[in-house]
């Protein structure tokens, strides 16, 4: 059954899985994924010579409930629903999780800008340089300085809360080019070394650096103390604790890592805590290697500037390492990124929730994916998944133009009825 697809050359892992399945007469294959976009576009009848039929989930797709302690798209964006349907067009509300970066390029609103510290368009020979730094400053933008200092503050707060032995990580993902990543590593190292030198000075409590730490703490974290059930230390608590700011700055300086194909750096949180009486405090710089397969324990601060002309839903989701379980420090997590990236993720969050809702409806009707039409919301600035995976998909546009729609169900909720009446009155 099924016809051969001569234009399809499956990837190695897909090929090997299918060849293993072909060995057995009775078999079960269950896929578990957070990005199901590519799976639903697999053709259910196309096959290849060596592998046979592809891995379309013909029997069922189950939407697993999101645990209450998981910080995912829906929670971060506070996705709004009305009677189960996602509210499509609304402004992204002020959310202290996001810090919009505008100083990474000379013209932050120009997607084709190639000037500045880390502009949207740069190549492997790019030298990151912030145009407006003072003569004695490290050439990184203020947003990255603040992000690094925020990481030091959140680490101090977590130590105060009793999570001393837990790993604490910051992610810096700004370029896909390994040579550029190593320059960023040098700049970040120089900046943290400067912080350490100032913190170790005898009069450090009167230094501008400590004043800046205090300002960031109150502006970005302590101001939200009434919105969390976790203990929120005062500024003095952070200074007086055994594992204080001064201690953390020193640890961070020793543990800045580059994770890419040219680096020998590794992450070993367990071994570190076994050799010390506290967890690893580390800043991790990288690119594509960080998108999957590497656990960033205790990730609280992410600085993410990757850009593409037409990014893919699933690739962006894999890069979004800030999604996950953040027990005891969910209120301290922050993402520094551009407003474009925020809009991309908001759209993906709406598209994902709509797809999950479709899976729930399909299951409630007892239908299978073979019987049920599955669709994913598109965006003119994004691609759902790779063109190879979408070769059997087709694009459709829905419109109510020249259509007569008959309403056969009515809302009972009094508030909804009054709202509809006011809207049409």
Name these PLM-found stretches.
Residues 116-119, 124-161, 167, 175-178, ...:
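C-terminal catalytic or substrate-handling cores of phosphate/nucleotide-
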Residues 1-6, 134-139, 143, 157-283, ...:
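Conserved C-terminal RecA-like helicase domain
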Residues 1, 31-32, 282, 287-292, ...:
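Subunit-assembly interface segments of extracellular/virion macromolecular structures
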Residues 2-157, 169, 204-212:
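Conserved P-loop NTPase catalytic core
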Residues 53-62, 189-197, 300-329, 356-360:
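C-terminal, active-site-flanking charged/polar segments
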């Amino acid at each position: 059954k099924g016809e051969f697809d001569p234009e399809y050359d499956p990837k190695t892992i897909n090929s090997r899985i299918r060849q293993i399945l072909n060995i057995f007469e009775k078999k079960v294959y269950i896929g578990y994924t957070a990005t199901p976009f590519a799976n639903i576009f697999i053709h259910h009848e196309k096959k290849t010579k060596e592998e046979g039929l592809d891995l379309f989930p013909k029997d069922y797709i189950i939407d697993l409930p999101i645990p209450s302690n998981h910080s995912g798209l829906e929670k971060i964006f506070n996705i709004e629903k009305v009677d189960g349907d996602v509210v499509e067009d609304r402004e992204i509300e002020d959310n202290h999780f996001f810090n919009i970066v505008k100083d990474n390029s000379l013209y932050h609103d120009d997607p084709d800008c190639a000037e500045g510290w880390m502009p949207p368009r740069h190549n492997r020979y790019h030298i990151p340089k912030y145009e407006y730094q003072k003569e004695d400053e490290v050439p990184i933008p203020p947003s990255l300085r603040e992000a690094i200092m925020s990481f030091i503050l959140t680490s101090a707060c977590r130590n105060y809360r009793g999570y001393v032995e837990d790993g604490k990580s910051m992610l810096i993902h700004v370029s896909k080019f390994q040579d550029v990543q190593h320059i960023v590593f040098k700049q970040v190292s120089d900046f943290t070394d400067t912080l350490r030198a100032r913190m170790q000075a005898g009069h450090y409590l009167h230094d501008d650096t400590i004043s800046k730490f205090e300002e960031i703490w109150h502006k970005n974290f302590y101001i939200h103390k009434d919105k969390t059930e976790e203990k929120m230390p005062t500024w003095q608590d952070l200074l007086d604790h055994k594992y204080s700011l001064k201690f953390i700055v020193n640890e961070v300086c020793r543990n800045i890592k580059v994770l890419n194909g040219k680096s020998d750096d590794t992450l070993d949180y367990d071994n570190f805590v076994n050799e010390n009486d506290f967890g690893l405090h580390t800043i991790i710089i990288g690119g594509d290697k960080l998108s999957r397969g590497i656990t960033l324990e205790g990730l609280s601060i992410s600085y993410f500037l990757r850009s593409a002309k037409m990014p893919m839903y699933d690739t962006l989701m894999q890069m979004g390492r800030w999604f996950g379980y953040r027990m005891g420090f969910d209120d301290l997590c922050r993402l520094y990124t551009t407003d474009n990236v925020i809009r991309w993720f908001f759209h993906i969050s709406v598209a994902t929730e709509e797809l999950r809702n479709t899976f729930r409806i399909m299951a409630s009707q007892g239908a299978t994916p073979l019987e049920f039409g599955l669709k994913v919301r598109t965006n003119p600035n994004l691609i759902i998944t790779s063109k190879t995976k979408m070769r059997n998909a087709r694009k459709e546009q829905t419109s109510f133009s020249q259509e007569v729609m008959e309403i056969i169900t009515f809302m009972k909720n009094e508030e909804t009825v009054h709202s509809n009446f006011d809207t049409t009155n």
